[in-house]
A protein has these predicted regions:
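A conserved mid-domain beta-alpha-beta active-site/ligand-binding segment of alpha/beta enzyme cores
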Residues: 116, 127-164
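Cys/His-rich short segments
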Residues: 153-206
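Acidic, Ser/Thr- and proline-rich intrinsically disordered linker/docking segments
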Residues: 277-326
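Broad, structure-driven detector of short, well-ordered beta-strand segments within folded domains
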Residues: 86-88, 176-178, 193-195, 257-263, ...
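Soluble catalytic domains of membrane acyltransferases
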Residues: 1-131, 147-148, 171, 182, ...
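Phosphoinositide-dependent membrane-docking surfaces
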Residues: 259-289
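Short amphipathic C-terminal alpha-helix that caps PH/PH-like domains
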Residues: 72, 125-141, 308-319
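Anionic N-terminal interaction surfaces
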Residues: 201-258
């Protein structure tokens, strides 16, 4: 079985080289075109080989299965291969994306949901196939957790939640939330809450008891900030490193410093990208931000904790044509 994986994983030092050597995965460039990936998948499938693809292309931030490109249905129909839908549950709480390498002890489950023959796929439209895939794979981790709570034990359960949450719901300030052990506190107004082993949140006057609802509120606030920004920066993040990315040949340092997002431009160290020219934006892992502007690809990293996911919401709002991937 050949797995479709991010091209950037294959550049991740010795581990990336081992993955490439042992698995021969099909590379997919973050925030870039998927045309070459699709062609490789079709070639393997028509040779009778198995290909595994996660249609969302990303791990969820809020526990809800993300949307995927509508081309998945067309690919499944034209491949001439059978389609097996396989659903994983429990992974969101066992290894939260915002937590980095923190693993929690709990229950995960995986099982095949449906097998569609080539004949069944040919009898459906690409849209109907997509609807079946959504029906088979959709998951809301918090909805499941409310019905059947499972504990996911570990250390420092809340640490690095700042990678997801950057707005205090009490005072409204940005970048004032700080995590330690299982607690997050706003250093400006004193608001605080705890992250429980079940993934739920508890605290005095806390408006949300889960990260799904908090994230939905925060996305709405990001849209508001974009609309009200006028000529002022919407976000500013300090101490970042920007590299340009060349397909298959690594990265090259562009500059270090601060990044700022305006309604019309993304300012990076030694580069300014008009928002209208941004064609793709995505995240690798918890906070490596990938930006595509035509044939030029950038990766923005930092050794300190940042909430980079906010740029995905903002840029997809400011430029409706941008290809958006979490």
């Amino acid at each position: 079985t050949y797995f479709v994986t991010s091209e950037h994983l294959l550049r991740a030092g010795l581990g990336g080289k081992l993955v490439g050597w042992l698995q021969s995965p099909i590379p997919r460039q973050k925030s870039g075109s998927a045309a070459s990936t699709v062609l490789t998948m079709m070639r393997y499938l028509r040779r009778g080989m198995n290909v595994c693809v996660f249609p969302e292309g990303n791990r969820t931030w809020d526990g809800v299965t993300a949307e995927f490109l509508p081309s998945i249905g067309k690919l499944a129909r034209s491949s001439g291969a059978s389609l097996v839908t396989y659903k994983l549950t429990g992974g969101y709480f066992a290894s939260p994306r915002w937590a980095g390498n923190s693993i929690r002890r709990g229950k995960m489950h995986g099982a095949a949901v449906r097998v569609y023959s080539p004949e069944e796929l040919r009898a459906m439209s690409p849209q109907e196939i997509n609807e079946r895939i959504v029906s088979d794979l959709h998951e809301d981790a918090y909805e499941r957790q409310r019905k059947n709570p499972v504990r996911f034990e570990g250390k420092a359960l809340a640490e690095h939640l700042e990678r997801l949450l950057f707005l205090c719901p009490k005072c409204g300030r940005m970048h004032t939330l700080q995590s330690r052990d299982d607690t997050v506190r706003c250093w400006k107004c004193g608001f605080s809450f705890r992250y429980l082993p079940t993934g739920f949140l508890v605290g005095e006057d806390i408006p949300f008891d889960n990260l799904r609802d908090w994230t939905r509120w925060q996305k709405g606030e990001i849209v508001r900030l974009c609309d009200e920004a006028e000529d002022k920066p919407i976000f500013t993040d300090t101490d970042v490193r920007v590299d340009t990315v060349a397909s298959g040949s690594g990265t090259k340092l562009l500059g270090r410093g601060d990044m700022r997002l305006f309604r019309g431009a993304l300012e990076l160290p030694k580069a300014e990208i008009p928002v209208s020219e941004i064609t793709g934006v995505s995240l690798m892992g918890p906070q490596d931000l990938y930006i595509s502007a035509g044939d030029t690809h950038y990766v923005i990293r930092s050794s300190t904790v940042h909430c980079m996911v906010k740029y995905l919401t903002a840029l997809s709002h400011l430029n409706g044509d941008v290809h958006y991937g979490e």
